[in-house]
Amino acid sequence: MTLSFAPGDSLAHRLDPRSKLLVQVAFAAVAYAYTTPRGLVVLTLVAVGCLLAADGGPRDLWSYRVAFPVLLFAPLVAGATLGAPWFRVERAATTGLASYRVLLLLVVAAAYVRSTPVRESRAALQRTVPGRPGVFLGVGVALVFRFLPLLKRDLVATREAVRTRLGAERSRRERMRLVAVGGLSRALSRADRLGTALVARCFAWNPTLPRLAFRRVDAPALALAAAMFAAAVLRVA
Amino acid sequence: MATNTESVDLVGDEAATNLARAALFAALVGAFAYVTFPNPVSPVDVTLQVLGVFLAGIFLGPVWGGASLVLYLAAGALGAPVFEGGSAGFGQLVGQTAGYLWSYPVAAAVVGAVVHRGATLRDLDSVGLPTLVGAMVLGTVVIYGFGVAGLMLVLSLGPIEAIAAGAAAFLPAEALKIAAAVGVVRSDAIAAA
């Protein structure tokens, strides 16, 4: 189960992608400013609210499972000491809160990913970052989304080919090299064909993008982002 | 659709090819996140992302290599499943892997700058083995320096604790990746003109 855009008509789906990005940044700021038990309780409600607003659920967090061991392990490492008292509870608690904060950030990010199609993300990026860097980011991000599945398939094919030829008997370094050579040569040939195709189709610095507009439905999200920013600034100041 | 009335401003041939390569390398680093190998010293598997970072610096040079990894981060933040374990989202850029992720563009630029001795690309056949290995060792130092600093800041750990929690188990595998990258650069199958 990977986390990806799921079509829908939830509140989060109807928001402008820029409001959702602002909410995420503001949430991160406020989460770092208020890493206290009380602050995190409030932020848990906000984070769960965001995920519910995107029609998401616990299964959307499954793709973050590789992060969980470190988050669980870190408080234990922080608490452990060599020599008496062997385990310092307050150090473990500080890191435990920090770990939980990271989990909340992932929940809010999951809500964005679930509710935002690629072309809207791209348009948001390109309209926020001005000029050619914005176009570069926008086009590049769209191409990464497009080519990731193809390159993943290339790598799987390479690994299968290596295995079929008893490559699993080879050393780990050699197996890594074979997979990398396979992936890289496919990626380079795809890139060269793509570059030629882009030029042939009048690839321009100023393409036409889908229209984005803040609407009334964005007001609560923008207000939430502003409130969280204000809270974070107040705390730091 | 929004309407644009200005005239079309074409992207040049070279820039278009470089952009395509940067995007493909970003996608390749993402695809490498799914390729796991058993770790020699720990039950946690290692992925090949760092190898992708090295290769981006070596094959694209400091400017486009760095730009490629910026694309990787942007695509991941906007929802492409390119981060560790196929995850995505802005949360990763401010979470416990933040240090590692933000180090990638810097590391690719550093590797590229050392290998090519500046911003203009030179023929990889003329690059000596010590330069190649030195560049990647430096890149590894950058990645783990940022990564450990990120763990310390995000999870309020001390330096030793951060190394124990997120670096010690993976560092030995980096030597394998450096060796594999040398093999890739010296391979006849890759002809990047």
Region locations from a protein language model:
Chain B
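Hydrophobic transmembrane alpha-helices
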Residues: A2-G66
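Short helix-perturbing small/polar motifs within transmembrane alpha-helices
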Residues: A2-V8, T17-L24, A31, Q92, ...
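Interfacial helix-loop-helix junctions of multi-pass membrane proteins
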Residues: A80-G86, G150-A164
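Membrane-water interface at transmembrane helix exits
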Residues: A33-F37, G76, V111, V115-A119, ...
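Alpha-helical transmembrane segments and their cytosolic interface
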Residues: A2-A23, E161-A193
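Alpha-helical transmembrane segments and their helix-entry boundary regions
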Residues: G65-L69, L101, L132, A162
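Small-polar-interrupted transmembrane alpha-helices in polytopic inner-membrane proteins
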Residues: F25-V29, G65-A80, G147
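Interfacial aromatic-anchored transmembrane helix boundaries in multi-pass membrane proteins
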Residues: Y34-D45, L73-A107
